[in-house]
Amino acid sequence: MMRGTPQMPEAIATRKYFDREFDRQAIKLLPNEYYVTAEDVVLTTVLGSCVSACIRDEVAGVGGMNHFMLPDDENAGADRMLSTSMRYGCYALEVLINELLKMGARRERLEAKVFGGGAVLANMTTLNIGDRNADFVLKYLRTEEVRVAAQDLRGPHARRVSYFPRTGLALVRRLTRQDDTVGIEREERALARALSTSTKAPARGAVELFTRQTTARIPT
């Protein structure tokens, strides 16, 4: 159920740079961040067990991305601090959709593409964080009646996602051991440690995929 969620400036991605590969400004999202825009930019992030939802309204010309770590916070009360809850998909998706609506998007026109939910580390398989995130994002969007146009979820690999909100194009690179996955593995181990010491574990189209060896394009 959508609520009146305020904008969260502290959670808006601020890492901007010029991407020479795509010849345009890029915004890099870290975990617990989101970004919405009407500009012709590329939004990028790297995912392990985390999930990103890329949502846009083609008619309104606005789109955005988020990056969340866990499905839901069942222990959160009504007085929760939203600025510390963007790690949870329930809040991250709520904020993203509400910000798009504020920019002129219409709920019935929203289109989503979702990525991530990988089991990057062997010891993470028992926690099923990636699977839970993947299940959650699909269930949430179905409940909110947001059409999922494409998905690349689960599996044993990390992903680098580049999303163009103006056109809806999503490029997904499935990272291999030859790619730089050190940062991802560090984050996954930290998440695994945090969950293993917690008294409560979290509750249970069209994409272009490319690796260093091969590139496959599926029409958008």
Swiss-Prot record:
It catalyses: L-glutaminyl-[protein] + H2O = L-glutamyl-[protein] + NH4(+). Its EC number is 3.5.1.44. InterPro entries: CheD-like_sf, Chemorcpt_Glu_NH3ase_CheD, Cytotoxic_necrot_fac-like_cat. One of its GO terms (molecular function) is protein-glutamine glutaminase activity. It comes from the Bacteria. It holds the Pfam family CheD. The keyword Hydrolase applies. Belongs to the CheD family. Probably deamidates glutamine residues to glutamate on methyl-accepting chemotaxis receptors (MCPs), playing an important role in chemotaxis. This is Probable chemoreceptor glutamine deamidase CheD. It comes from Cupriavidus metallidurans (strain ATCC 43123 / DSM 2839 / NBRC 102507 / CH34).
